[in-house]
Amino acid sequence: TNYFLVAARDRIRVNCDLKHVDAVLCCDPKIFTHTNPLVGLKDGGVFIWESNLKAEHVWQRIPKRFRQELIDKKIKFYTLAGFDIAKKHTPSPELQTRMQGNSFLGAFFKTSVFLDDHGINQATFLDAVLTQYKKKFGKLGQSVVDSNLEVMKSGFEDVINISHGNIDDVD
């Protein structure tokens, strides 16, 4: 399943699948076993991958052909233990999956140039997110709003930059 996030200062009035993107957020820790998640990611783009591995072990989990692409395209590579973040905030498996995506939202805004390019500081960003969460989750209670905000903030704070290793590193 593919999900798309289109972020812009002004309202976007077009709805379509995207073929060329600035960032890929991958919530599937086994993605490299069944597809190429880097297809369509522009040179210098951002790739965020679900992983709870320590940073020094991540590169070893990437198959060589994808390591080459990460290096050649100068892709900025990050990991996020989004599912672990979600599990801290809800015992419900269904909600954990949704909240995992919420943590990736935070990671996206931390790693992309969107906030800087639009002159949005962190306080303004958090206020805008809180306003949207109140609209979306307010009828469910303040604790739901708060937990969703905490998950998003954890994604923002806990995303890890992964340095490119060597193509021939042990896998």
Predicted feature descriptions by range:
Residues T1-D171:
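Active-site cofactor/cluster-binding pocket
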